[in-house]
């Protein structure tokens, strides 16, 4: 059993916290208030960033001490939203939220994952007709191995998990969010994910 703090209690945070609890982990969910986030992060071994991507960097910078030496699982995409509320552009073009978090929190092991799918697929990958792919981006091999284990706890088969390399590769997976509005307008909010077929 691992002590996990999920920062963000929206649809993504709620979905992940319920599934991780069901997998036997000790999960604390924190809302957007700084005090709750700091308390949850301080007592956790692993912290999941499920806060809105546009404000994640500012929120997590305030937790620098609480996050030091810990694994930060970043599942957010930092976007500029259009009038319909769907992503219309990237907040960090040419970079990524994951890269900015790692640069700002050098004592924290940032691992980017689960950001290339509708939130329902994060914890129910077998619900799709085609096998989905989940990606890992991060500098620390040990941290990525731990996160790989969490993904397996969430129902991801080993051969569905692809390690892309360092945190610089998060730029590619975060850019994939620009597909989302077109997919939703075409097919609605039916569950979907990127998939690498070999």
Residue ranges and their predicted role:
Residues 1-35:
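NAD(P)+-binding Rossmann beta1-loop-alpha1 motif at the extreme N-terminus of oxidoreductases
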Residues 15, 19, 104, 150:
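Rossmann-fold NAD(P)-dependent oxidoreductase module
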Residues 132-198:
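Active-site-lining helix/loop region of Rossmann-like oxidoreductase modules
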């Amino acid at each position: 059993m691992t002590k996990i703090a999920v920062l963000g209690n929206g649809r993504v945070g709620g979905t992940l916290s319920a599934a991780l609890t069901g997998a036997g982990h000790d999960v604390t969910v924190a809302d957007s208030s700084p005090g709750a986030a700091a308390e949850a992060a301080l007592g956790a071994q692993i912290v999941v960033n499920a806060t809105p991507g546009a404000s994640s960097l500012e929120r997590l910078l305030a937790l620098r001490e609480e996050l030091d030496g810990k694994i930060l699982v970043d599942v957010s995409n930092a976007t500029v939203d259009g009038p319909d509320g769907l992503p219309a552009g990237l907040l960090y073009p040419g970079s990524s939220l994951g890269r900015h978090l790692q640069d700002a929190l050098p004592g924290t092991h940032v691992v980017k994952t689960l950001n290339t799918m509708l939130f329902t697929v994060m914890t129910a990958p077998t619900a799709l007709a085609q096998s989905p792919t989940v990606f890992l981006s991060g500098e620390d091999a040990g941290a990525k191995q731990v996160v790989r284990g969490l993904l397996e706890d969430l129902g991801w088969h080993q051969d569905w998990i692809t390690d892309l390399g360092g945190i610089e590769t998060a730029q590619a997976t975060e850019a994939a969010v620009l597909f989302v509005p077109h997919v939703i307008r075409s097919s609605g909010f039916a569950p979907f994910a990127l998939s690498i077929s070999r």
